[in-house]
């Protein structure tokens, strides 16, 4: 599937909806059910999830102005992968207590870093 402004903006909306819902779920439904360490893991997942959904919103907006910049599409895919792998694995660790799932988290972190690097490079060359 090709990443374009419409898809990036749609994914951003979906990811932000999910981040808000998961933040509320963690603050209310999980309150008292997770130990403090796992609560911190959950909060980190929500924070990185939301920030990078906003980054995806920004990239999607830039794609409206520069649709020919393929680097923007790559950055959008990298932020999408980062949210899925980084935040997704942290949510799973917090809910299950299976710390081994945390081995996935660095792959999401690398995707976030690569997304920011690609975005910076694309902007520099614009």
Provide a role label for each language-model segment.
Residues 1-126:
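Polytopic transmembrane helical bundles with strong interfacial aromatic enrichment
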